[in-house]
Amino acid sequence: MDISGMQINEVQSKLKEYYNVLKMARKPDWEEFSMTAKVALAVMFIVGFVGFVIYILMEILPGALK
C-alpha cells in the first residue's frame, strides 16, 4: 500500500469515529439547554467581573503608590 492509500484509510477511520459520535448524540431538552445557557452566562459574567476588578486595581494602584 502506498502513502496515499494509508492516508485514505486514516481519513475513513476518522470519518467512522465522527459518525459514531454523531449517532450517539442527542438533542437536549429545553430544561437541559436552559440550565446550560444559564451556567455559561453566569461564568461569562464572573470572568468579566474578575477582569474588570483587575483592570480597576491596575488603574488605581499605580497612582496610589506614588
Swiss-Prot record:
Principal location listed in the UniProt entry = membrane
Q: Which InterPro entries match?
A: Prot_translocase_SecE_dom_sf, Translocase_Sec61-g, Translocase_SecE/Sec61-g
Q: Name one Pfam family in it.
A: SecE
Q: Does the keyword Cell cycle apply?
A: no
Chain's gene name: secE
Q: What is the lineage of its organism?
A: Archaea, Methanobacteriati, Methanobacteriota, Archaeoglobi, Archaeoglobales
GO biological process entries: intracellular protein transmembrane transport; protein secretion; protein targeting
**Species, as recorded:** Archaeoglobus fulgidus (strain ATCC 49558 / DSM 4304 / JCM 9628 / NBRC 100126 / VC-16)
**UniProt keywords, alphabetically:** Cell membrane, Membrane, Protein transport, Translocation, Transmembrane, Transmembrane helix, Transport
Member of which family? Belongs to the SecE/SEC61-gamma family.
Q: What is the name listed in the Swiss-Prot or TrEMBL entry for this protein?
A: Protein translocase subunit SecE
According to the record's subunit comment, the protein's assembly and interactions are: Component of the Sec protein translocase complex. Heterotrimer consisting of SecY (alpha), SecG (beta) and SecE (gamma) subunits. The heterotrimers can form oligomers, although 1 heterotrimer is thought to be able to translocate proteins. Interacts with the ribosome. May interact with SecDF, and other proteins may be involved.
Tell me if Transcription regulation is a UniProt keyword of this record: no
Function noted in UniProt: Essential subunit of the Sec protein translocation channel SecYEG. Clamps together the 2 halves of SecY. May contact the channel plug during translocation.
Q: Where are the transmembrane segments?
A: 41-61
Instruction: Kindly list the GO molecular function terms attached to this UniProt entry.
Output: protein transmembrane transporter activity
Kindly give the membrane topology term recorded for this protein: Single-pass membrane protein
Cellular localisation:
Cell membrane
What Gene Ontology terms describe where this protein resides (cellular component)? plasma membrane
Task: Please give the superkingdom of this protein's source.
Answer: Archaea
